[in-house]
């Protein structure tokens, strides 16, 4: 009887470990979009995005002069130019309850207007945090990125910027959103 109890306990533990490992691997690779059947995007497709956010960064200068000047010792973290296609999402709702798409557009717009993080959900389910790139202008509220994200909420668009990956966290810093003065 004791052996059978131990075997059952070992089998249950193995199942839990496989489940946790599988979920962790899926999260790391971005293997799927949560609840894809719940609501589709408001505009655009992965083959034909409805718009474009940000200006293209270059390998020679992935960061703006403002960001370089604001960084520690004038050396920002490594970044590389990227153009990625995906749906603009409100990260807080997507990561908490899986909501995205046209049915969530109004809620997502309110969340982002009130300071929740903006994300890009790609076709393979990868998630990127989207942040305005110009450091001081972002800090001082002198960019239009958040407004653009609200306008394009639930749209599939192309986002241009600089990719930064730190400890598995992926962010695209979107350049060219400073307000005209």
What are these regions (language model features)?
Residues 5, 20-22, 28:
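Low-complexity, intrinsically disordered/propeptide-like segments
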């Amino acid at each position: 009887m004791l052996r059978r109890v131990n075997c059952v306990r070992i089998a249950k533990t193995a199942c839990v470990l496989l489940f946790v490992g599988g979920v962790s691997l899926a999260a790391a690779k971005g293997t799927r979009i949560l609840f894809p059947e719940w609501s589709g995007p408001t505009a655009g497709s992965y083959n034909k995005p409805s718009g474009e956010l940000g200006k293209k960064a270059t390998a020679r200068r992935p960061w703006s002069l403002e960001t370089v000047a604001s960084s520690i010792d004038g050396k920002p973290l490594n970044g590389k130019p990227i153009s990625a296609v995906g749906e603009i999402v409100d990260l807080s709702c997507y990561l908490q309850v899986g909501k995205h798409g046209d049915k969530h557009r109004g809620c997502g717009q309110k969340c982002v207007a009130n300071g929740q993080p903006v994300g890009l959900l790609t076709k393979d389910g990868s998630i990127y945090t989207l942040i305005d790139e110009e450091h001081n202008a972002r800090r001082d509220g002198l960019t239009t990125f958040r407004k653009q994200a609200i306008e394009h909420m639930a749209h599939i668009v192309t986002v241009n910027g600089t990719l930064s990956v730190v400890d598995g966290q992926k962010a695209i810093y979107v350049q060219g959103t400073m307000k005209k003065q």
